From Swiss-Prot:
This is Thiamine-phosphate synthase. Its cofactor is Mg(2+). GO terms for molecular function: magnesium ion binding; thiamine-phosphate diphosphorylase activity. 4-amino-2-methyl-5-(diphosphooxymethyl)pyrimidine binds at Q52, Y53, R54, S55, K56, N84, S123, K153. It comes from Nitrosospira multiformis (strain ATCC 25196 / NCIMB 11849 / C 71).
Amino acid sequence: MRTVSRNEIKRCSAAPRREITGLYAITPDTGDTSHLVAMTWRALAGGARLVQYRSKTLNEELHREQARSLAHLCRRFDVPLLINDHIDLALEVGADGVHLGREDAPISQARLKLGHEKIIGISCYNELESAIEAECNGADYVAFGAFFNSVTKTDTVPASIDLLRQGNLEIRIPIVAIGGINSDNALELISAGADAVAVSNALFGARDIRSEAAKFSGLFKRQSFHPSLSRTSQ
């Protein structure tokens, strides 16, 4: 990967910063659409501020059905829905954007298809330079992780808490932390500079999804009492 110059970083820092913060719910992989919608409703009712529809096992028809149902639900809550990987599906169902990984389409291609109003998030794993380059290429947020052992994904790369602190110094777009996050370890990431925490198993595997979502949301309210740790004033 090429090195990004300081002049490029300075130009990128002038770009508008989207408000992406709080609990970022990543849906579980299930073929039961009604159950998926019901679980996501509970997460939204508990305070989730962003939803990502992620499915790796379903056929195209069911994938489309679920994405459309979640788009309708998220509009009711006025919460953005992002589609994992699939740009065309995001356009088809009227989702608010996409989340892309290392093997997915480049940001430029996604932006060309989606336009400037849609959200594009990028997985940067444990690579700060990838995040800097993603910002310069027009990403709306970057995701670092895994910070802890993940049940949802077993092929993750470890990321350190210091990466969040360094990210605060180098980039201005929101930073999402991901990987093995639960309500017991999330505050450490938020305090280190994560604008949002992306959670799947600890949220949707909870006995009471709504209460668990509220617990995560409460961590951000708790952090708001420490303005010196906030990135919004940068």
